[in-house]
Amino acid sequence: MASPDWGYDGENGPEHWCKLHPIANGNNQSPIDIKTSETKRDPSLKPLSISYNPATAKEIVNVGHSFHVNFEDSDNRSVLKGGPLPESYRLRQFHFHWGSTDDCGSEHLVDGATFSAELHLVHWNSAKYPSFADAASQADGLVVVGVLMKVGQANPNLQKVLDALKTVKTKNKKAPFTNFDPSVLLPSCPDYWAYFGSLTHPPLHESVTWIIFKETISVSAEQLAQFRSLLANAEGDKEVCIKQNYRPPQPLKGRTVKASF
C-alpha cells in the first residue's frame, strides 16, 4: 500500500492526503480521540475470542513507512471472533505507529491524551471475501485491533520483534519471522472500545471495525528508539530514519463509540 505520493511530514503529510485520496475527508475516518464520557456501554458486546497460531507467523518486511509482520492467511489457524463481529476474521499482519519523541506516537487518543506508540493487528473477513485485497475496501472487510503503548518498563514480549528489525533495516527488505504468537502483546484486561472507521494511511478505505483495548501495554524509551532506527530509504540511498508515522485524530462526525465495559 505504500506509495511515494504520501508520507508523514511536509507536502506529503496527512493534511495533504486528501488531494490524491479525497476519502481522507470522509465521514468515517480514523484514528479518533476517544472521549470516554461520550462512549456508550453496549451489553451486547461479547468478549473477544482471539486464537493465534505461532506457526502462521511468516516474515517481517520494511514497507518504508513502518514494518509489517506478515502471517500465513490461507486458512483459519489465526483468527479473531466475538466482540462486535458477526464472522471470524483472519489475521493478516501486525505493525506499529510511533513518534519522534516518547510523548507522542499513538494514532488513537483517549480523552485528548496521546501515547508513545500503538500496535495494530489487521484482520480480514475470510468468511465473505476470497482475499485480503478483496476485503480491504469493503465496509465489513477488515477488523483492526489497536493497543496503546505507554512509555515505562521494557516489554520483554516485544523483544523478538525489535531484534528482527536489524534484518530489515531498509525499505523493501524482508526476512523470515516465524514461531511468534502476537497475543503475547495484548493487555490482560479484556475491556475495549469499538467503532467504525478507516485505514489510517492511504488508501484510507472506510472498511475497518476498530477494537481498541482500554488497557495499555508498556514499552521502554530504549525500545521506542529501536523503532525510530528503522530506515525509510532503500539500500544504498541517503539514510532517512522513520522518526514518526502516525496520523492525527479525525472528526467523529456523529459516530458512536461503544464500550464493552
Swiss-Prot record:
Residues 22-41 are annotated as: Disordered. It catalyses: hydrogencarbonate + H(+) = CO2 + H2O; urea = cyanamide + H2O. Zn(2+) binds at residues 95, 97, 120. The active site is at residue 65. Substrate binds at residues 200-201. The modification N-acetylalanine is found at residue 2. Its EC number is 4.2.1.1, 4.2.1.69. It holds the Pfam family Carb_anhydrase. InterPro entries: CA_dom, CA_dom_sf, Carbonic_anhydrase_a-class, Carbonic_anhydrase_a-class_CS. Its cofactor is Zn(2+). It is found in: Cytoplasm. Residues 4-261 form the Alpha-carbonic anhydrase domain. Inhibited by acetazolamide. GO terms for cellular component: cytoplasm. SMART domains: Carb_anhydrase. Its main location: cytoplasm. The keyword rRNA-binding does not apply. Keywords: Acetylation, Cytoplasm, Lyase, Metal-binding, Zinc. One of its GO terms (molecular function) is zinc ion binding. Catalyzes the reversible hydration of carbon dioxide. Can hydrate cyanamide to urea. Belongs to the alpha-carbonic anhydrase family. This is Carbonic anhydrase 1. The lineage of its organism: Eukaryota, Metazoa, Chordata, Craniata, Vertebrata.
